[in-house]
Amino acid sequence: VGALASAGFHVFTAKSYMSRIRGGLNWFDIRISNRELFAPKEKADLLVALTREAFEILGRETSDGLILLDSHEAQGAYAIPFTQTAKEIGNAIMANSVAAGAVLAVLGLDNKHLMEYLRKQFHDKPAEVVEQNIAAAGAGEKLAQSCAGRLPAAPEGAWDSVYAGADAIGLGAATAGVKFVTAYPMTPSTATLNFLAESADRYGILVEQAEDEIAAINMVCGSTYAGAPSLTVTSGGGFALMVEGISLAGMLELPVVILLAQRPGPATGLPTRTAQGDLNMAIHAGHGEFPKVVFAPGTHQECYAITRHA
């Protein structure tokens, strides 16, 4: 994704990952274009399957497109030994780098952007690790030459950074001047908490992991009362625990800001999925009557701008 962005393409990504307890198939959906994107496609034009299971489950999601399968022979797929090649270079974990090189070959892109990105990504690793990943990407490019294609030209220029929606929210909060962030980790809001924790020194933010959501909302009430712009992040179950604290903020007329990153289902719900089922709860949370403003951003730009406004 970083290499494609640095080449000047617009990139839209979505991911699906299973819980550690249940297990299952993880996948990452990447859509690229020379124009701005706002949603994934229903069918894939290129599938890179690192396991046989991925091929069997996701192979039917391709629109008569190309399938690259790790080592296994299968009808309708090109067999490319990602893992074996990575092992020969140094470590099986570099199969992803082999696959990345193969993808760029299929797309007909210059590999310089991938090589630059790998150096940037592994800048804090030993030089040997950097060179092995570069070699792995180069090997993947050679393995996929037989099915190379050509993408339409990218717009002029390059993107310096690639942000997820959760990152855009965190960046909006940081640049708006938030000084105190506290939360109990609860996916999918944890991604924003992690971004703010990693950016704390740069933006002068105090980040505190609370023991639970009740403590988090009360700490935000206290810090806001003391004059520090504050934020807490949570999901449905955690937001339910915060309701009494939200009512306290209403009584004290404190401008509390809460990120409610929604997951599907009642109670614990589905921790590794996202949804839009908590809007009524957000609007009506708290007893008595006091003003609340509920924003529902729909794009990365809105995630950034609306968070700054909040």
Feature locations, PLM:
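Thiamine diphosphate
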Residues: V1-E42, L46-F55, F180, T187-A282, ...
